[in-house]
Amino acid sequence: MSAILQGAGAATALSPFNSIDSNKLVAPSRSSLSVRSKRYIVAGSDSKSFGSSLVARRSEPLIPNAVTTKADTAASSTSSKPGHELLLFEALQEGLEEEMDRDPHVCVMGEDVGHYGGSYKVTKGLADKFGDLRVLDTPICENAFTGMGIGAAMTGLRPVIEGMNMGFLLLAFNQISNNCGMLHYTSGGQFTIPVVIRGPGGVGRQLGAEHSQRLESYFQSIPGIQMVACSTPYNAKGLMKAAIRSENPVILFEHVLLYNLKESIPDEEYICNLEEAEMVRPGEHITILTYSRMRYHVMQAAKTLVNKGYDPEVIDIRSLKPFDLYTIGNSVKKTHRVLIVEECMRTGGIGASLTAAINENFHDYLDAPVMCLSSQDVPTPYAGTLEEWTVVQPAQIVTAVEQLCQ
């Protein structure tokens, strides 16, 4: 991977089928694991030499004990100051605005990103502040304006390209694959492509098949591209800022049902590491790896699991490419069991790639096969009850953990 990469109003609330009230939902605080001494980003690395020390000896077959830790327990916030509350889409906007203030080379382009403010208001107010050249409304032609953004990056700008819906970016797949991802390599290093491609996706509230795409499975095979998925206002802003500053092309995945999440974020400047997972809930019995909206389904299931005597460790992987196998590996060495929960399709999804990486690097530390819960391999139905059936629900997560921990 390192040989290919160039350098190192609001939306709807959570699904009505999810019992979490998004208007009251406050994203948990964040913390990473210990300082990295070694990072695994290439499949096939020697898991025996992992890190500076082993985390735990192999466990005996798990017998659930009473667990008193709250299911939503997380490490303390990275900020010592009260900060200010923002919805997730507002956090994205704030991060983008700060980077445009900081660097005059940062620009925005896409459909209705100008005075309309974007389909989910992530670019609201930017055209008034920075003008119509730095916040450019484009024709409805994804292939054209994506190519324009890549060309602008080749000449020294740092474009942020918005897809009104991630599904529409299929029309720009040639530009994203053959140009965005590969030009640094095919030009012999003459060009860097510091482009951010972002937009809403995921299964929404009866948006139909074409507007419910999860394109991470499509883009993960493109060499030279990094992919991250935000899940809280804090990491949405931090990942946005980090992606803009990166010399690599970065795709930032945003979920349509998370735009209204509210969280207090620091007043001081911060960025998130593009290749770092987030420890959401420490635990001992099983590692649950997830990202984006499924983070909240997992945390809902964790409350039930705690009441049943299980102590799950929940990690939001955030970096979809490359995987943070340091954080993941430390957790696997401690719990010896892995459940992956994703909204991506099962066939060829992120979960399949993550399963392969874990088996190749940490097979000797597993006491049970890696299990992956994914969306059904069907077009997303419009009918609400059928739409619910296609994606992983908290009850399925509870059942899977019980099976793995027998």
From Swiss-Prot:
<keyword id="KW-0786">Thiamine pyrophosphate</keyword>
<dbReference type="GO" id="GO:0008270">
    <property type="term" value="F:zinc ion binding"/>
</dbReference>
<feature type="binding site">
    <location>
        <position position="142"/>
    </location>
    <ligand>
        <name>thiamine diphosphate</name>
    </ligand>
</feature>
<keyword id="KW-0670">Pyruvate</keyword>
<feature type="binding site">
    <location>
        <position position="248"/>
    </location>
    <ligand>
        <name>K(+)</name>
    </ligand>
</feature>
<dbReference type="Pfam" id="PF02780">
    <property type="entry name" value="Transketolase_C"/>
</dbReference>
<feature type="binding site">
    <location>
        <position position="195"/>
    </location>
    <ligand>
        <name>K(+)</name>
    </ligand>
</feature>
<feature type="binding site">
    <location>
        <position position="243"/>
    </location>
    <ligand>
        <name>K(+)</name>
    </ligand>
</feature>
<dbReference type="InterPro" id="IPR033248">
    <property type="entry name" value="Transketolase_C"/>
</dbReference>
<comment type="function">
    <text>The pyruvate dehydrogenase complex catalyzes the overall conversion of pyruvate to acetyl-CoA and CO(2). It contains multiple copies of three enzymatic components: pyruvate dehydrogenase (E1), dihydrolipoamide acetyltransferase (E2) and lipoamide dehydrogenase (E3).</text>
</comment>
<dbReference type="GO" id="GO:0009941">
    <property type="term" value="C:chloroplast envelope"/>
</dbReference>
<dbReference type="GO" id="GO:0005783">
    <property type="term" value="C:endoplasmic reticulum"/>
</dbReference>
<dbReference type="InterPro" id="IPR005475">
    <property type="entry name" value="Transketolase-like_Pyr-bd"/>
</dbReference>
<dbReference type="InterPro" id="IPR009014">
    <property type="entry name" value="Transketo_C/PFOR_II"/>
</dbReference>
<protein>
    <recommendedName>
        <fullName>Pyruvate dehydrogenase E1 component subunit beta-3, chloroplastic</fullName>
        <ecNumber>1.2.4.1</ecNumber>
    </recommendedName>
</protein>
<keyword id="KW-0809">Transit peptide</keyword>
<keyword id="KW-0934">Plastid</keyword>
<dbReference type="GO" id="GO:0004739">
    <property type="term" value="F:pyruvate dehydrogenase (acetyl-transferring) activity"/>
</dbReference>
<comment type="subunit">
    <text>Tetramer of 2 alpha and 2 beta subunits.</text>
</comment>
<dbReference type="GO" id="GO:0048868">
    <property type="term" value="P:pollen tube development"/>
</dbReference>
<keyword id="KW-0560">Oxidoreductase</keyword>
<feature type="binding site">
    <location>
        <position position="244"/>
    </location>
    <ligand>
        <name>K(+)</name>
    </ligand>
</feature>
<dbReference type="Pfam" id="PF02779">
    <property type="entry name" value="Transket_pyr"/>
</dbReference>
<keyword id="KW-0479">Metal-binding</keyword>
<keyword id="KW-0630">Potassium</keyword>
<keyword id="KW-0150">Chloroplast</keyword>
<dbReference type="InterPro" id="IPR029061">
    <property type="entry name" value="THDP-binding"/>
</dbReference>
<feature type="transit peptide" description="Chloroplast">
    <location>
        <begin position="1"/>
        <end position="70"/>
    </location>
</feature>
